[in-house]
Structures are given as C-alpha cells and as structure tokens.
C-alpha cells in the first residue's frame, strides 16, 4: 500500500457550490429534463419536479454532504466509519461503484456531443438534420469510438490536475459561461414564431396532464439531475471546509440546478413548438429529441448554424462538468481505499472507462448483436445504475443517517459554521419517512417498467 495522501479541499463556498452545481447541471438537465417535461405534461411535470427538489432533493444533498464532511472520506470510508458491519460496507460500495459504471457510458454521449459540435463549427450543421444521420453515426463504430475517446481524455486530463486546480477551476470557468449561453439561447428560442405556445405548455401547469407516472418520472429525474446517490456529494462534502454552510450551499445548488433545467426547457420546448406546432409525436421523441429533432429545428431557423454552435458548446460544458465530478468520485475512492496516488487512481479509472465505455460506444454498431437482458450496453448500464443501484444507494444513506449515525449528528454537522439549521423539520421528516419511500417507489417502478409490467 502506498503512502496515504493529504486530503484535498475546495478553496471555499464558491468552489464547492460551482463544482457541486457542475456535477448536477449535466446531460440530465440539458438533454433528459426537456424531453421528459415534453413527454409528461410540461408545466405539471415542472411543478412536481420543483416540489420534489426542495424536499426530497434538498434532504438527500444535505445528508450526503454532511456525511462526507463528518468523515473526510469518500463513500466506502464514510459508511465504514460508523462500523464494520457488512451492511455498512455494502452501502458505501454501492455508492462508490455507481459513478464508476456511469461515467463510461456518459462519456459516450459526451462524445456524440463533440461530434455534433464539430459538425456545426465546420459548417456542416445542415447534415445533422438529415434523416438517418444520428443512427448512421452511432452505428458507425469507429467514429463513435474516437469521439468517446476524445471526451474521455479531456475528462481525465482535468481530474489529473486535482480538486482545486482541476475540478474546481474548470467548474468556475464553465458554469458562468453555461448560464450565459442558456439565457441567450432560451431568449432566442422563445421569440420564434409560434414559440409562446411552447412557453405556456412548459411553464403553466395543466392538471389534465397529470398522472402517477409524472410523479415517478420526476422522482427519477431528480436523482439523475441533482447527482443524488452517486457518491459525488459524499466525496465533495469530504473536500468542504468546516466554515462553509452546508444548508446554504445546498440551497445554492438547488437553485442553480432548477434554473438551468428551466432554461433548458425554454431552449428546447418552445423551439420544438415553433418547428412542429406542438405535434404530439415530436414532443414524445424522448432521448432522440436532442440528436434528431433539435438539429431539424435549428435548420429551420435563420441563425440556426450559430445557435447550433452555441447550444452544443453549452451541452458540452454541462457534460464535462458532470463527467469530471463522476470521475473525481471514483478516483477518490481508489485513493482512500487503496492508498493510491491521484495519478495512479486516475489512470486505472481511465482504463475502466475505456473498456466499459467502448462496449457502449460500439453497442449500436459492431456489437449491436450483443445485448444484456435485451438491452444494448449503454441502455443496460443506464438502467442498472439509475433505476436499480441509485435508489438502493439512497435507501442505504437514509438508513445510515436514521439508524446508525442519528439525525442529531447530521444536525450538529450542518450547524458547524454557527448558523441555525433553518429547514431542520423538513430534513427530519423527509429523511425518516418519505425519502426511503420515494426511493423504493422509483426502484419498484423502474424494474416493473423494464420487465414490461407497466409502461413509463
């Protein structure tokens, strides 16, 4: 075992908030949130999401961040700090393994973004609007693999630089740019002819569009969007200084994440309405919305090529800030549990990313005939982590806080900076009752959907 490393730390509140917000504001906001909002009722989905974010999401962010800062350890060590029982180690390891499994396929999607951005920059954006472009690209094998490797190399280079010089510095640059771009593009989108109908659909709740699946889907999106139960917040909490407010930082991350999700919705949904008149089939496009529908929308705009460049720069920045957070969490686990140096840990994680990511990158091409329980590799890794492992990890965190540590200890950690825990009652109620119930609902619903018992 190598010599133990000195614990890294963020420079202060701004460093933590922008890094945590960067982890949260990723493809989940820019890509996933708009197509789910379009599919599950627009304004009513947004309303349900906001309610869940300020209750369920808030509670889990506070709990995970406090757990990390209390122990100064990544997930495995943080859970293990309260006992050596097998259940505690399992809870830590499932939180630690999730980012290791997510970041490879996440980087594949990041590679797709690089390809689209390069096409717009080179003046070939019109080709992206052609029928069959996306399917031909992801099934090409070599092109998809090269783009994935470029994105992976960029991510690893940032993580190699360290917490303060890599993760924090990049987040401090990319997040403000991301905000500005989102406002500019959303402003342009909502002024297109016919776009106001899309604004109304997205912002005005319509009870007629409400269903149980709206709630379940919003719960699942909140996990994906706020980086809950991925080990990231525990890891970032371990880098947080004692004089930084956990509650205040959590509220900043909540606001940042929700505003960017809303901006993403205003970028995409009004533009789709302007393009298609709110055609139901277009709104139901799902994951294809960004890579198939949006290029067609941009092609119909006067400044479509410029908007395409700005949009995919924004998406790339969002993807990078999240991928470095996922990778940092994985690297931190190897540093803590194996005593490895950052460079060795990052190198090993890089090898894992290439091996697992290549399965996803080639899964729609040369490896398309190989499936896992009927799913392509990327879809399987997404299902395994988001639908199965993350709800289990969230339940494990709730049980750790309520049955092992004690809610009072979390409260003490939250008030370390001398400020009162203003939403203590909300936290106590949610962590003891609704959070584990919500996580269990997501788990059961997702598995039932995968087995074909229900349709989401």
Set out the residue ranges of the language-model regions:
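Membrane-interface "cap" regions at the ends of multi-pass membrane proteins
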Residues: 1-31, 60-65, 69-82, 86-93, ...
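Select transmembrane alpha-helical segments in multipass membrane proteins
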Residues: 9-20, 44-48, 86-100, 146-151, ...
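A generic transmembrane alpha-helix motif of multi-pass inner-membrane proteins
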Residues: 378-399, 422-456
């Amino acid at each position: 075992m190598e010599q133990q490393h000195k614990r890294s730390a963020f420079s202060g509140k701004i460093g933590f908030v922008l890094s945590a917000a960067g982890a949260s504001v990723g493809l989940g906001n820019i890509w996933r949130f708009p197509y789910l909002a379009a599919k599950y009722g627009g304004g009513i989905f947004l309303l349900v999401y906001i309610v869940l974010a300020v209750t369920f999401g808030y509670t889990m962010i506070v709990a995970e961040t406090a757990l990390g800062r209390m122990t100064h350890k990544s997930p495995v060590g943080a859970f293990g700090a309260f006992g050596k029982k097998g259940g505690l180690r399992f809870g830590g390891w499932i939180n630690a393994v999730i980012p290791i499994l997510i970041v490879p396929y996440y980087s594949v999607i990041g590679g797709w973004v690089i390809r689209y951005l390069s096409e717009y920059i080179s003046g070939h954006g019109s080709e992206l609007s052609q029928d069959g472009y996306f399917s031909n690209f992801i099934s090409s094998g070599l092109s998809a693999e090269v783009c994935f490797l470029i994105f992976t190399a960029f991510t690893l280079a940032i993580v190699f630089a360290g917490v303060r010089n890599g993760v924090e510095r990049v987040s401090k640059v990319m997040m403000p740019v991301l905000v500005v771009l989102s406002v500019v593009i959303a402003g342009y989108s909502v002024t297109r002819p016919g776009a106001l109908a899309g604004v109304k659909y997205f912002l005005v709740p319509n009870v007629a569009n409400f269903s149980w699946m709206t709630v379940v889907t919003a719960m699942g999106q909140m996990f994906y969007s706020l980086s809950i139960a991925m080990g990231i917040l525990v890891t970032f909490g371990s880098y947080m200084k004692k004089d930084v407010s956990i509650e205040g930082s959590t509220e900043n991350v909540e606001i940042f994440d929700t505003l960017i999700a809303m901006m993403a919705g205003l970028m995409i949904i009004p533009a789709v309405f302007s393009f298609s008149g709110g055609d139901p089939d277009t709104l139901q496009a799902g994951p294809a919305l960004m890579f198939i529908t949006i290029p067609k929308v941009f092609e119909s705009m006067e400044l479509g090529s410029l908007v395409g460049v700005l949009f995919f720069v924004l998406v790339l920045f969002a993807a990078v800030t999240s991928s470095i957070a996922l990778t940092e969490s994985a690297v931190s686990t190897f540093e803590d549990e194996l005593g490895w140096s950052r460079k060795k840990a990052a190198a090993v994680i890089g090898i894992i990313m290439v091996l697992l990511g290549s399965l996803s990158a080639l899964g729609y091409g040369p490896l398309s005939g190989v499936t896992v329980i009927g799913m392509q590799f990327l879809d399987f890794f997404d299902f395994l982590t988001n639908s199965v492992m993350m709800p289990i990890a969230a339940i494990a965190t709730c049980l750790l806080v309520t049955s092992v540590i004690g809610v009072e200890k979390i409260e003490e950690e939250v008030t370390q900076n001398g400020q009162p825990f203003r939403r203590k009652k909300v936290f106590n109620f949610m962590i003891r009752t609704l959070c584990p119930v919500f996580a269990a609902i997501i788990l059961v619903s997702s598995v039932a959907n995968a087995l074909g018992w229900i349709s989401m």
